[in-house]
C-alpha cells in the first residue's frame, strides 16, 4: 500500500478522531516537500552545480531549478545572478513517493541515527531537517559522486499548529527522537 492510499484510508480517519476535529477536510495533510541545496563552491566550480542538478533529479525524480544570487557579495566572491544552488518542489504523487523512500529507506541509513529532532517545527506545522550527505539515498552510488554534499528538506503541511504537524508526520512514519 502506498503512502498516499495509507494516508487516505487509515491515517486521515485516525487523525480526525485523535485531534478531535469535526470535518475530514480539517485534518492536516502534506501540501509540498521542498528539497534545497546551497552550493557555495558553484561560484568557482561549474561542475559542482551540474553534478548537484543530476543528483537532485535522481533523488527526487524531478528536474531541479537553479537558484541564483539576488545581489553581489564580495566576501563570498559572488556576483548578482550567479548560480549558487538548486531546489526542487515536490507535490502530489511524486511528493508521496519521495516521502515514503525518505522515511523508510534514507533515514535509517544515516550514521548513528536515533530519530529526527522533534523541535524542528516552525510554529505553523511545517518541518525542516538537514541531511549531511546524499549517500543515504539508495539511488546515489558512492562511485558516481565527486564530493559529499548535504541538503535541506522542508515538509510543508496544512496543519495550523506544531502539535498537529507532529501528529501527522508521526502517523506517516517519521521517526522522532524522544
From Swiss-Prot:
InterPro entries: Ribosomal_uL5 (IPR002132), Ribosomal_uL5_bac-type (IPR020930), Ribosomal_uL5_C (IPR031309), Ribosomal_uL5_CS (IPR020929), Ribosomal_uL5_dom_sf (IPR022803), Ribosomal_uL5_N (IPR031310)
GO molecular function annotations of the record: rRNA binding; structural constituent of ribosome; tRNA binding
Positions of disulphide bridges: none
Keyword vocabulary terms for this entry: Ribonucleoprotein, Ribosomal protein, RNA-binding, rRNA-binding, tRNA-binding
Single GO BP term: translation
Highest taxon above the source species: Bacteria
Gene Ontology CC: ribonucleoprotein complex; ribosome
Pfam families: Ribosomal_L5, Ribosomal_L5_C
HAMAP family in UniProt: Ribosomal_uL5_B
Oligomer and partners: Part of the 50S ribosomal subunit; part of the 5S rRNA/L5/L18/L25 subcomplex. Contacts the 5S rRNA and the P site tRNA. Forms a bridge to the 30S subunit in the 70S ribosome.
Chain's role: This is one of the proteins that bind and probably mediate the attachment of the 5S RNA into the large ribosomal subunit, where it forms part of the central protuberance. In the 70S ribosome it contacts protein S13 of the 30S subunit (bridge B1b), connecting the 2 subunits; this bridge is implicated in subunit movement. Contacts the P site tRNA; the 5S rRNA and some of its associated proteins might help stabilize positioning of ribosome-bound tRNAs.
Family from the record: Belongs to the universal ribosomal protein uL5 family.
Protein name: Large ribosomal subunit protein uL5
Upper lineage: Bacteria, Bacillati, Cyanobacteriota, Cyanophyceae, Synechococcales
